[in-house]
Regions:
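Short, surface-exposed connector motifs at secondary-structure boundaries
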Residues: 1, 18-25
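PLP-dependent aminotransferase-like
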Residues: 1-14
Length: 166
């Protein structure tokens, strides 16, 4: 068999693949809304489909975990590819006995992250587009309006180019 990964926007690459008669199986990871569209299109030709929908990718940390080992994994799981992967750790579920220690240490690690151009030796690069940046800023604004307490915030390096999606 052959596995082809075709990057591109859904309206272009995705639509073309969904309607192509040579595609005999679809696998989609993403939003429920788009997953339903993929499933409906696949059903028209009775093409098998595998869907992983919804996201949130929680990371689970139990009280017997080695926090020193868990911490770098949790940070990387959240910021890999600037958090723009379907498996980005958007939630961390922590067992009560270690909650205080882990959240304090995680907040300290996150606060030390620096964001900027991908060519510099930084922990986190820019978001893919202004649309995505605006979307993320909208999530943060709604969280603040809902009274969510932020435990940490990273920083943008001072010499980051203007117009970057940081």
């Amino acid at each position: 068999g052959v596995l082809n990964i075709v990057p591109g926007l859904g309206e272009e690459a995705g639509e073309a693949l969904l309607k192509h008669p040579g595609v005999s199986h679809y696998s989609f990871t993403g939003s429920t809304e788009i997953g339903v569209k993929v499933q409906q299109e696949a059903a028209k030709r009775a093409v098998p489909v595998t869907l992983e929908l919804g996201g949130k990718s929680p990371q689970l940390v139990f009280s017997d975990a080695d926090i020193d080992k868990a911490l770098p994994f949790l940070v990387n799981a959240a910021i890999q590819n600037a958090g723009q992967t379907c498996s980005a750790a958007t939630r961390v579920l922590i067992e009560k006995p270690i909650f205080q220690e882990l959240t304090e240490r995680l907040a300290k690690e996150i606060s030390s992250l620096r964001t900027g151009p991908a060519l510099q030796d930084l922990e986190c690069g820019p978001l893919i587009s202004k649309v995505q940046k605006d979307r993320v800023e909208g999530f943060l604004l709604r969280a603040k309006q809902d009274g969510v307490e932020f435990l940490a915030e990273g920083s943008i390096v001072e010499d980051a180019p203007q117009g970057g999606n940081y």
